[in-house]
């Protein structure tokens, strides 16, 4: 094997390693996969997202406006109510059918707080 071929092989191996390690945290699911033993499903999943979102907002200092904050909390609660309703519908949820999403990441697999906060609705200053 020549030096350039060896270098190319090592470079490709390193690239594969980097790609696999950076994308390895994404979970994929089959629709018939069973829940993870430490997974959180249904209403407890929606409550976990709500708690994670509230924690993230408090760590970021909130919006700083009482009036805007109340409006944001109402919007967030409406979003989380919708999330709970989807969790109750279970298999009818488009999040499950896609093979990736909150049910795949946190019910059929085990997720962490960072993955939960990815599902928080966006907080904007201008609403109110």
UniProtKB/Swiss-Prot annotation:
Annotated localization: Secreted
Sorted alphabetically, which InterPro entries does this protein's record hold? Answer: Insulin-like (IPR016179), Insulin-like_sf (IPR036438), Insulin-rel_pep (IPR016724), Insulin_CS (IPR022353), Insulin_family (IPR022352)
Record key words, sorted: Amidation, Carbohydrate metabolism, Cleavage on pair of basic residues, Disulfide bond, Gamma-carboxyglutamic acid, Glucose metabolism, Hormone, Secreted, Signal, Toxin
Q: Which residues form the propeptide?
A: 59-89
Task: Identify the Pfam families for this entry.
Answer: Insulin
**Biological process annotations from GO:** glucose metabolic process
Give the modified residues of type 4-carboxyglutamate. Answer: 115
Let me know which tissues express this protein, per UniProt: Expressed by the venom gland.
SMART domains recorded for this chain?
IlGF (SM00078)
In which family does this protein belong, per the annotation? Answer: Belongs to the insulin family.
Its protein name is Con-Ins F2
